[in-house]
Amino acid sequence: MEQVVIVDAIRTPMGRSKGGAFRNVRAEDLSAHLMRSLLARNPALEAAALDDIYWGCVQQTLEQGFNIARNAALLAEVPHSVPAVTVNRLCGSSMQALHDAARMIMTGDAQACLVGGVEHMGHVPMSHGVDFHPGLSRNVAKAAGMMGLTAEMLARMHGISREMQDAFAARSHARAWAATQSAAFKNEIIPTGGHDADGVLKQFNYDEVIRPETTVEALATLRPAFDPVNGTVTAGTSSALSDGAAAMLVMSESRAHELGLKPRARVRSMAVVGCDPSIMGYGPVPASKLALKKAGLSASDIGVFEMNEAFAAQILPCIKDLGLMEQIDEKINLNGGAIALGHPLGCSGARISTTLLNLMERKDVQFGLATMCIGLGQGIATVFERV
């Protein structure tokens, strides 16, 4: 079986969905920009030699509809002979795109693929056109389709207080801002055209979603967003709404060496699981455990983790049940997470994996794990190994 390697990984800055940098930039353009950039950064690989493009996107309608992967590839002037498919596993879409490409390479059906994902939540809101089947209520609580209420449920089940959530959210912003100030994101962010507050076209090379002024005291003043009477989850402890894209160049190790390209990491194992939709945010726990089992590793073998911060109330129970509460500041989301950077649904899996690869290199660790919860009760995880 072929070894699957990540040759390169990049992303756009994360733009605010409400009147942000990419308010006049379409999702296809964000995607095409990264496709062109990956190919330009790795000229040894001819675009025509790509076997496929796998691109995650959740709301596949309006500008994100009709197979955005193919639309973006055409905009990027990728040769018409290269196919492209849009992947949807909700929040885990672009990580699923990576898994799909990896399996093609493992079986010998592909040698080189572009993978990634995008979501423009300013142009195509998360709830646009959603119409749940009324019969679902026979098997699943109606509230299971409301992500904020599933986070409230997890917080109550695991004893996660409002104070713990506020502290974690403040940490996310502080760490993301520190990473920005220290240029820790420089190797992953590709400058991307957008418009400033005055409408002037400019190149953005930083995440505009981060709020460096965030404090625990300020967060404590916010009202509950989903359960106004008994709730603890606020807008400040939820992932921000943002627009962005991320992309990776994935190859067989043999093809990468043949072309003189240096792999950054191997895909050591992959896992996806289902869980109770009412606690959808718990999915990273069984997914991570399964991925670790497949890799023959334990949580203690992992040097750094990237865990998508859908909600502070959601990630803290996952950290607790993976036995990592005492290692948060040494191993988990060291450059902040989605609470500060936002969670553009189809982008986030590739985004956290890209950040993870850079952290693995900076911290000089052998193994890293990226994991995410998924709406309606799933979890997905990937273990990476430095080459």
Curated annotation (Swiss-Prot):
Disulfide bonds: none
Protein role: Catalyzes the final step of fatty acid oxidation in which acetyl-CoA is released and the CoA ester of a fatty acid two carbons shorter is formed.
Organism domain of life: Bacteria
GO terms for MF: acetyl-CoA C-acyltransferase activity
GO cellular component, one term: cytoplasm
CDD domains, per the entry: thiolase (cd00751)
Entry protein name: 3-ketoacyl-CoA thiolase
Organism: Escherichia coli O9:H4 (strain HS)
Pfam families to which the protein is assigned, alphabetical: Thiolase_C, Thiolase_N
